[in-house]
Amino acid sequence: MSQPMTLLEIMRSASVIPVIAIDDPDHAVPLARALVAGGIRVLEVTLRTEHGLGAIRAMSQVEGAIVGVGTLTQPEEFAASRDAGAVFGVSPGLTQSLIDAAKSSGLPLLPGVMTPSEVMAAREQGFRQLKLFPAVPAGGVGMLNAIGGPLPDVTFCPTGGISIESAPKFLACKNVACVGGSWLTPKDAIAAGDWAHITELAKAAAALRAA
């Protein structure tokens, strides 16, 4: 059996991680297939709707998909998400109870931070991969470049307010492995079952790393 990917390996394998909210469980599998077909394999399925865990369970069965759980805010969500098939977790912030849950569940956690002090506090707890959130209100590219000076060993996935147009500037930062974004999964396209459009969005996002 091969070793599971580390969180850093997962981040580096992606240019963009789509932030997904599933309103209809029937959309989960075709959405995952459409994204993977476009070259986007790492998927963050949030717990913002009641269908989150079910979607993780279904999407993790799609060949080529690397499925994580997003919007982790409660300790009990870690083990439940792991059992559903998530191989990494993402939280909007970091608390001691979430740290404890991540350790006990074994689910690699990408916690959200917004300030240099929060970066340093997470770093003291052993985290070297962090989510700058919300990225644009937090200072965007300028903040990332500034943090990279005193804290060069931290790697980020900025999320929040990023678009296909602004993503290349973030990806050009030395301390950015990937970005998170919701533009790959527009609600109108999902509702219409326009999976071909989502595949095209995924292809454009996957090409950002090679650009």
Predicted regions and their residues:
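Short beta-strand segments at enzyme active-site cores
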Residues: 43-47, 68-69, 91, 112, ...
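Alpha/beta catalytic cores of nucleotide-metabolism and tRNA/nucleoside-modifying enzymes
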Residues: 1, 23, 114-120, 124, ...
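Glycine-rich beta-to-alpha transition loops that act as phosphate-gripper elements at the mouths
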Residues: 21-23, 69-75, 91-95, 111-116, ...
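Conserved N-terminal beta1-alpha1 strand-loop-helix module at the mouth
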Residues: 1-87, 104, 164-165, 172, ...
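Short secondary-structure capping/turn micro-motifs that flank functional sites
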Residues: 50-52, 75-76, 97-98, 117-119, ...
